A protein has these predicted regions:
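A glycine-rich helix N-cap at a beta->alpha junction
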Residues: 51-66
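Short beta-strand scaffold segments in enzyme catalytic cores
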Residues: 24, 71-75, 83-84, 202-206
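Glycine-rich phosphate/adenosyl-contacting loop at the front of the ribokinase-like
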Residues: 1-38, 43-54, 215, 219-222
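Residue-level signal for inorganic ion chemistry
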Residues: 26, 111, 156-160
Length: 224
């Protein structure tokens, strides 16, 4: 609540972010992965570049710019739910012309975008990807109203329940059944396929005229 001070149990600094995590995971699966973007001239930027490279990710087109790298402050409750506050840092410098100049010198099968860089740069990436038939996955986080017209050109849209509600201007789904309806509504905006992630409740999806729900796996304590 505003004005309230709470005690935490631990503090951890780590490298990550959706794009970096996805790139590293894809590289470990044996896929050829290139990361396009920008990091700052701070120690975090140097670590991000070297860490991604150590996971087998091509960082040739990961530019270094003056200023801080993008940073996220993530608070995690005992239940596992989190809140995230972003400072775009170097991510805000990814603009259309640098994107056109560095966007993958050779064709890719799939291009993954997220809303932590300017919408204009994402639009340039999407047009480039579709020019040779690649599929485009948009992870719309953070949710931004400026992407309303962008949706119709996206092949795969991935959002969580909060982002889904914000994108549609309605409350987040309170159950998997509601999430299926939300996925259908998002599908109506134009993406060919939609996934709404629901944390421990799995994910809802919509594809063509079909929609459904996939439960989450039941696991023991997560170790990493």
């Amino acid at each position: 609540h505003p004005g309230e001070t709470l005690s935490g149990s631990s503090l951890t600094y780590s490298l990550g972010g959706k794009g970096a995590n996805q790139a590293a995971a894809a590289a470990h699966s044996g896929t050829t992965v290139a990361f396009v973007g920008a990091v700052g001239s701070d120690p975090s930027g140097q670590r991000l570049r070297s860490d991604l490279a150590s996971h087998g990710v091509d960082v040739t087109h990961l530019r270094e710019v003056e200023g801080p790298s993008g940073t996220a402050l993530i608070t995690v409750a005992a239940s596992g739910e989190n809140t995230i506050i972003l400072d775009a840092g170097a991510n805000a410098t990814v603009t259309v012309e640098p994107a056109k100049a560095s966007l993958f010198p050779s064709p890719a099968d799939i291009v993954v975008l997220q809303a932590e860089i300017p919408a204009e740069a994402n639009a340039a990436a999407l047009a480039w990807a579709h020019s040779f038939g690649a599929r485009v996955l948009l992870n719309l986080a953070p949710a931004r109203p400026t992407y309303a017209d962008f949706m119709a050109r996206v092949d795969i849209l991935v959002v969580n329940e909060t982002e889904a509600g914000l994108t549609l201007g309605m409350p987040a789904p309170a159950s998997p059944t509601e999430a299926i309806g939300i996925a259908r509504a998002l599908r109506g905006l134009g993406p060919k396929h939609v996934m709404v992630t629901l944390g421990a409740d799995g994910a809802a999806w919509a594809s063509g005229s079909e929609a459904g729900h996939c439960p989450a796996l039941t696991l023991g304590e997560a170790v990493d």
